């Protein structure tokens, strides 16, 4: 990928220096806990991280579920294609709109029960709901959180009813062992258990998506409903044009980029140019050391500058920590709830960076999505049993600029 992250494009993503931003309001004061997390942050430098990059799909079949993809945008490739999350799990808890698919990460573990394992992230496309979400994520048990962003973990053993126990052939010929659930024709994400009463051919996950499909100017079901009913054919209508464009997520070890940068003093794609990081003090962090917010931002910039196109940071180590762009608004250990399935500890597994909004062509509008980082915490035991899709915990850090724009 060859992407020019010049200053103008960064501003469109609302990624900017924090030197002119006001402190975030509404978050509890966790100064003591933040001090503890600062000590741990130094350890994060020693833990290997895997970076994820958004690439256009190399072929039309690689994002199908039988190839166990990591992907962003488009529609999810459900691991268990039958027993999908349903009911309120699929909805934004604020506006009740069905959540939109953000990305999925294929992250198998050595345990047999997690031979196949994928994490799915969904979120409401409304920034207003994400702002309301900020207050909710600070709630601690037994208070119930309302969320506009949710993550689900699904895992399967090697022997399972859906896929062959052998590795899939890399030629597009691989087929799943069973068909999946019928999905909503509009979002292609959630189970389509509602059917158009007129043509009896088109399925929806909700009345909201049925209404959206009916009103759509680009692929209105109102126009073709009678034609489908008369023909007896299944729906071939395009999904919603509001879905984010689909990308494969390819992975590289961060250390490979660090070595490349150490051998090359210049980096044309760096978010922070080499001339800016090597000032009179010799280090951007020293330049910004007077301010916690600026220091945190500078550390974030410096860390990602070797691979500025990264959209995801992943680690299988339970000792790994997120790379926080903002000093305030970080969770402490008590803010991360225990697994609500087995009661075990949750730890950080991956984070989603705002660079992905560039690939999704998200504009800088009044209610446009923006975040500093999205950190996903999962059950350390990756517990099995119970529901096929277990909801995990996600923490969203916003920049104060995101808040002030609303």
Where are these regions (language model features)?
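Preference for intrinsically disordered or flexible, low-complexity segments
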Residues: 1-406
């Amino acid at each position: 990928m060859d992407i020019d992250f010049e200053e103008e494009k960064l501003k469109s993503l609302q990624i900017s220096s924090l030197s002119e931003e006001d402190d975030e309001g509404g978050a509890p004061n966790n100064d003591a806990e933040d001090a503890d997390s600062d000590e741990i942050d130094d350890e994060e430098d020693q833990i290997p991280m895997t970076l994820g990059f958004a690439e256009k799909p190399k072929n039309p079949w690689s994002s199908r579920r039988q190839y166990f993809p990591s992907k962003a945008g488009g529609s999810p490739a459900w691991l268990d294609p039958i027993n999908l999350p349903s009911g309120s799990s699929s909805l934004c808890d604020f506006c009740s709109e069905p959540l939109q698919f953000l990305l999925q990460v294929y992250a198998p573990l050595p345990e047999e029960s997690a031979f196949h394992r994928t994490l799915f992230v969904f979120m409401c496309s409304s920034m207003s709901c994400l702002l309301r979400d900020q207050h909710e994520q600070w709630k601690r048990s037994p208070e119930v959180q309302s969320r506009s962003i949710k993550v689900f973990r699904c895992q399967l053993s090697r022997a399972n009813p859906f896929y062959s126990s052998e590795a899939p052939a890399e030629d597009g010929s691989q087929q799943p062992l069973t068909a999946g659930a019928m999905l909503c024709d509009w979002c292609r994400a959630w189970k389509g258990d509602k059917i158009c009463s007129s043509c009896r051919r088109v399925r929806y996950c909700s009345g909201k998506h049925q209404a959206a499909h009916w009103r759509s100017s680009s692929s209105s079901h109102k126009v073709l409903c009678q034609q489908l009913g008369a023909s007896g054919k299944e729906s071939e209508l395009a999904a919603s044009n509001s879905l984010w464009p689909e990308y494969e997520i390819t992975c590289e070890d961060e250390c490979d980029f660090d070595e490349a940068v150490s051998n090359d003093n210049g980096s044309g794609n760096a978010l922070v140019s080499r001339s800016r990081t090597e000032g009179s003090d010799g280090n951007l962090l020293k330049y910004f050391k007077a301010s916690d917010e600026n220091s945190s931002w500078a550390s974030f910039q410096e860390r990602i500058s070797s691979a500025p196109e990264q959209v995801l940071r992943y680690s299988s180590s339970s000792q790994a920590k997120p790379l926080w762009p903002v000093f305030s608004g970080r969770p402490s250990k008590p803010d991360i709830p225990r697994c609500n399935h087995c009661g075990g500890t949750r730890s950080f597994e991956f984070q989603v960076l705002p660079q992905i909004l560039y690939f999704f062509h998200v504009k800088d509008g009044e209610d446009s999505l923006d975040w500093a980082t999205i950190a996903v915490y999962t059950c350390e035991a990756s517990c099995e049993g119970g529901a096929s899709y277990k909801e995990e915990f996600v923490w969203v850090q916003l920049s104060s600029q995101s808040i002030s724009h609303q």
